Design a protein with these regions (language model features):
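S-adenosylmethionine-dependent methyltransferases
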Residues: 1-378
Length: 378
């Protein structure tokens, strides 16, 4: 199986440097070091209200100064995403109302249960699932897909690139959606749009190059407002933020994405919040909504969330649909894992689970398909 990164910034993060000298200061969190390189901090479960996030009307603006890398797995289309090391080093520059960037850095933790659920980085089972999809050749054309607990969103992005008609991304943290999932989706959509434009131009179908229309608009808008109000960049940013309405829905201007210019992107929706409130938000809008494919990678590490997760899968999977679950056998320190989840699913009696792949190197990992038991399918 070919598996390559075409860009890799070799950086040592502060946490890596400090790892050996990490002080155990006995604060309110309990820390464990379950797997080399992964630190999990547990805290009482809290609930986070669901919010929908919208791409800005000028999508290129989210990619200013973005440093990206590309993963290529076999015959799958290349997937672009923000370089994690650069993201970590520049995290202090970002708006982060949830304060998860500072907390994860301060605690050198990849997971703070109920606060930050790990979506800032790509977890290894995502790569397993991508490999399996390459091997088995799942078809996405015209499908409605949910990337549940998406983090970087690579699984949903693959579905989008492979022709899914709608892809919904959900992550617990709004910071993850705003600063990672959305930019990653844009990186892929905008690149494809530009390639398509170039192809059309080379065939002589289009006279002029649209070439980053958005960037031109941004420049003009910014120049204009800088001239007239002499506001600094950060003042402008704050102004935009203050214009957001109270429930967190972005300013109307940000919602007005031109779907004719960005057809792929207009098939995407982005949500933050815990699974229970995500479920009520999305069903309130459309009680009949069902997904043909649900991806969920590295989301069964905490037994306390099984009920909300199972309920969400049960309510949202289409009859005849499939859930792809990618997981480690066991999550040391948090206690969850495949066997506990299997027991839970069996007790509920709603889904069959079919093991598609066991990855033996390193910590044992699995890719599992879940379908409704026959009686529930139709
Ligand atoms: C370890 S991360 C995995 C991220 C990504 N799927 C990957 O494989 O790289 C777990 C993800 O599950 C989601 N998650 C965990 N518990 C959740 C909960 N109670 N409600 C909503 N989302 C949750 C978070 O969004 C988080 O990004």
């Amino acid at each position: 199986m070919s598996f390559s990164f075409n860009f890799d910034v070799q950086l040592t993060t502060k946490c890596q440097q400090d790892e050996e000298n990490q002080p155990q200061d006995g604060n309110e969190y309990s820390e464990v070091e379950p797997v080399p390189g992964i630190t999990i901090t547990t805290q009482d479960e809290t609930v986070k209200a669901a919010v929908e996030h919208f791409p800005p009307a000028t999508p290129h603006s989210l990619l200013n100064d973005a440093v990206s890398e590309t993963i290529t797995i076999g015959t799958l289309p290349p997937l672009n995403f923000l370089n994690e090391s650069v993201f970590e080093l520049t995290a202090y520059e970002r708006d982060d109302e949830e304060m998860i960037l500072s907390q994860t850095t301060a605690q050198c933790s990849d997971l703070i249960s109920g606060v930050y659920e790990g979506g800032l980085k790509v977890w290894e089972c995502t790569y397993d699932l991508l490999e399996l999809l390459e091997r088995d050749g799942e078809r996405f054309a015209e499908k409605i897909v949910l990337d549940l607990g998406c983090g970087a969103g690579l699984l949903g992005i693959l579905a989008l690139k492979r022709g899914a008609s709608q892809v919904h991304f959900q992550d617990y943290n709004s910071t993850v959606i705003e600063h990672v999932t959305l930019p990653n989706t844009l990186l892929n959509c905008l690149e494809e749009e530009e390639e398509e434009e170039e192809e059309e131009e080379s065939k002589g179908k289009k006279p002029g190059k649209r070439q980053n229309n958005d960037e031109v608009i941004i420049e003009e808008e910014e120049e204009e407002s800088m001239k007239s109000t002499e506001k600094t960049k950060s003042e402008l940013k704050n102004k935009q933020k203050n214009e957001e309405v109270e429930d967190g829905r972005p300013h109307a201007k940000r919602q007005a994405l031109d779907s004719s210019q960005h057809p792929k992107l207009s098939g995407c929706r982005f949500f933050s919040g815990d699974w229970t409130s995500f479920l009520s938000l999305i069903l309130k809008e459309d009680p009949s909504l069902k997904y043909d494919i649900i991806f969920t990678s590295e989301t069964i590490y905490n037994k306390a969330y099984y009920s909300a997760l199972h309920n969400t899968l049960h309510r949202l999977l289409a009859p005849g649909g499939v859930i792809y679950l990618a997981t480690k056998t066991h999550y040391f320190g948090v206690g969850g894992g495949l066997h506990l989840f299997e027991q839970f699913v069996e007790e509920k009696g709603v889904f069959d689970m079919e093991k598609l792949w066991v990855v033996e190197h390193g910590l044992q990992r699995h890719v599992v398909a879940m379908h409704f038991k026959t009686k529930d399918r139709f």
